[in-house]
C-alpha cells in the first residue's frame, strides 16, 4: 500500500553510465497527476488517494464524473486511478494537489503495469512457447502442430484451460523490480531500466516494488 503515479510510455532509448556502460531505458511521462479525491477510513472505510491523468474533452465526460471532478477543482483526465496508502499519509494530500515525480528516487525499485501489445490470433508454438516437432525424419505434416488435445472416449471432451491456439497479448501485464535510472523533475519523466509492457503512447501505472 503505497502511492504511485499514472504515466504514458514515451518509448525506449539508452543512456550511458560514468564507466561507459550502455543502459537500455524506457522513458515514462508521469506529468500532471492531480488528486481528485482523498478517501479516509472514517468515511470510505479505507485510506486511498485517487488521481487523474491525461486529458479528456468535456463532451466526453459523464455528468456524475464531471460533478466529481468539479468538486475537486481539477480538469478531466482519460485515466482515473486509485492508490491505497497508509492512513497517516493522508494529511499530506488534498483534492487538487499535484503528485510530482519526486515521490520516486534514482535507484529505487518499481513495478510497472501496462497493457501488452496485441498479437492477434497465434498458434500454440508462439502463444505458449511449445516446442516444434521434427523438421524431417518421418515427419511431413505436423511440424508446428500442437499435438494431442485430449484422451479417448472417456472423458470424451477437451478439458477447460487446455493450452491451444488463440488470441495473444492485449492483456494487463506487470514488470516487477525495475530500477529507476534517472528522475527528471523538470520534465516529469522517469527513466526505467529495461522494457515495460505496452506500445508507445500507452498508459502505465508505476508503483514502488512490492518485492523490493
Swiss-Prot record:
Lyase found in the keyword field: no
Annotated SUPFAM superfamilies: Translation proteins
Keywords linked to the UniProt accession: Methylation, Ribonucleoprotein, Ribosomal protein, RNA-binding, rRNA-binding
GO cellular component: cytosolic large ribosomal subunit
Changes after translation: Methylated by PrmB.
Statement: the UniProt record of this protein carries the keyword Isomerase: no
GO MF entries: rRNA binding; structural constituent of ribosome
Subunit structure: Part of the 50S ribosomal subunit. Forms a cluster with proteins L14 and L19.
Similarity-based family: Belongs to the universal ribosomal protein uL3 family.
Function recorded in the entry: One of the primary rRNA binding proteins, it binds directly near the 3'-end of the 23S rRNA, where it nucleates assembly of the 50S subunit.
Cited PANTHER family: 50S RIBOSOMAL PROTEIN L3, LARGE RIBOSOMAL SUBUNIT PROTEIN UL3C
Protein name per the record: Large ribosomal subunit protein uL3
Native organism: Dechloromonas aromatica (strain RCB)
